[in-house]
Amino acid sequence: MPGTAGSIWCLTCHGDVEVDYHHTTEDVGIALGQAFARALGDMRGIQRYGSFHLPMDEALILCAVDLSGRCTLNWDIHCTTEKVGDFDVECAKEFWLGFARSVPATVHFVQFAGENTHHILEACFKGAGHALARP
């Protein structure tokens, strides 16, 4: 996501992934949200709104962001599997909830098409990078 938004960030996280990825994924979302908020500073001179439709093969996802100072996550994403490799698909929503709370921002994800869970989630993250590059 940060590379797509025009910058490159490096984050190292050590979590209890031998149990599951839930808390680690949520904590990464929180940490990136806090870093993004610090990078925005007082938000002077930025556009408040950004959105992007991203096609990833058969998947089509809209990500819309409002840097409102209020936390809302609308997750209208419907994946066909519970896992991508070892990753629990529900953790993607937890990542974005942690991110939205930490900025704070309103973030919407809407799925228009898609069956392959990998493509759907990849479109969410890349679409968010493009939407966040617009404000």
Label every PLM stretch briefly.
Residues 1-135:
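Structural preference for solvent-exposed beta-strand-turn elements
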